[in-house]
Amino acid sequence: MNVATDPILTSILDTDAYKFHMQQAVFHRYHDVMVSAKFRCRGYELLGEYAADISAQVDMMRGLQLNDDEFTYLRGLPFFQSDYLNCLRQFRFDPSQVRIRNHHGKLDIRITGPWRDVILWEVPLLAVISEVVHHRRSPQVTTADAVARLRQKLLHFRRISEDLDTSRFRLMDFGTRRRFSRQVQFEVIAELQREFPYLIGTSNYQLARERGLPPIGTQAHEWFQAHQQISPDLANSQSAALQAWLDEYPDRLGIALTDCITMDAFLRDFGPSFARAYQGMRHDSGDPVEWGEKAIAHYQQLGIDPLTKTLVFSDSLDFDKAFMLYRHFWQRINLVFGIGTRLTCDIPGIKPLNIVIKLVKCNGKPVAKLSDSPGKIMCHDKAFVRALRKAFDVPLVVKKAS
């Protein structure tokens, strides 16, 4: 492949499911909201030299559109309404919304436009960045290398799990955004389907369609971040986001992300009504055992049987960490493990990129993420962070994200 001339992405469905799920909610509720998002490399690598290749790929994305077979596939799922699907059929990526440059060796990317458009850029753009960088750095790597590594991990999993009932272990593929390549992700998931009976789905809609897997995903941090400016009351913004999601999806897609403003602040908003309506919670930062214990205790305090709810773990998981969590919690609550980078970019000699794209403004005003892991905190306005901390009683000193 020539990453300067050959498109990495061949389908608009090659993205995470929750992007379409959120886009539908935005289409119905926040059609005119404007946002800005910014790229960040948490590993502080100098990726600016790849800006030209990434720009070329972004320009090629203007040709992606929902084809008839893909439209029929989405229409057969229980998540989508016809007005949204008809709109998605007309959607085209607009590269003018994306500014990409090499800024003193750093890769600088900013995306600005209507939220309903910007929302679809994040995952495919991150996948493009990852594949461009790895293709340039490690052209000798093959899909066979990735599959061989996966087989080693599956053998190890079987060994460490011999003494435990693993019938309730559930694995999801969350590996699109930081994959080594599209081909590696597709081959790894095909191998899991053949050899790992605990795979229950993928976050990638193209993979789900082509491999006959359930597509899985609910909402991301941006859903809660945008509500910090959409809601007239900052202190009520998280509750407003939770309610708006239920209004859009009253009986499905009910896993709530808990760490936009720390788990403790989330649980204060996640009262009896929300706790009963949502099917469970997703962990994405902080100590996972401590988080899980808090979640179970919260359900018990509300008189809810934890075995009727599900905890999804998705923070930097690998098979060892997932099994440790399964061993700790499996008899007390339902569990699902979303593994991403350690499925789709776990290849000997390859260092995965630690890259994200996050909202920084909504309707021209700042938004913030105050997660349970200091390294995942995203904020660009100290005054707003102070206001957010005060509104949610978060005793955390936040440093500006670089």
Curated annotation (Swiss-Prot):
Q: Which GO terms describe its biological process?
A: NAD biosynthetic process via the salvage pathway
Which residues form each disulfide bond in the chain? none
What reaction does this enzyme carry out catalytically? nicotinate + 5-phospho-alpha-D-ribose 1-diphosphate + ATP + H2O = nicotinate beta-D-ribonucleotide + ADP + phosphate + diphosphate
This protein's UniProt keywords: Ligase, Phosphoprotein, Pyridine nucleotide biosynthesis
Q: In which pathway does it act?
A: Cofactor biosynthesis; NAD(+) biosynthesis; nicotinate D-ribonucleotide from nicotinate: step 1/1
One matching Pfam family is NAPRTase
Q: Which GO terms describe its molecular function?
A: nicotinate phosphoribosyltransferase activity
Q: What is its EC number?
A: 6.3.4.21
The protein's matches in InterPro entries, at most eight in alphabetical order, are given as: N/Namide_PRibTrfase, NAPRTase_N, Nic_PRibTrfase, Nic_PRibTrfase-Fam, Nicotinate_pribotase-like_C
State the top-level EC class. ligase
UniProt PTM = Transiently phosphorylated on a His residue during the reaction cycle. Phosphorylation strongly increases the affinity for substrates and increases the rate of nicotinate D-ribonucleotide production. Dephosphorylation regenerates the low-affinity form of the enzyme, leading to product release.
Q: Phosphohistidine is carried by which residues?
A: 221
Q: Name one GO cellular component term.
A: cytosol
Role this protein plays: Catalyzes the synthesis of beta-nicotinate D-ribonucleotide from nicotinate and 5-phospho-D-ribose 1-phosphate at the expense of ATP.
Q: To which protein family does this belong?
A: Belongs to the NAPRTase family.
Extract the NCBIfam families matched here.
NAPRTase, PRK05321.1
Q: What is this protein called?
A: Nicotinate phosphoribosyltransferase
Q: Which organism is it from?
A: Sodalis glossinidius (strain morsitans)
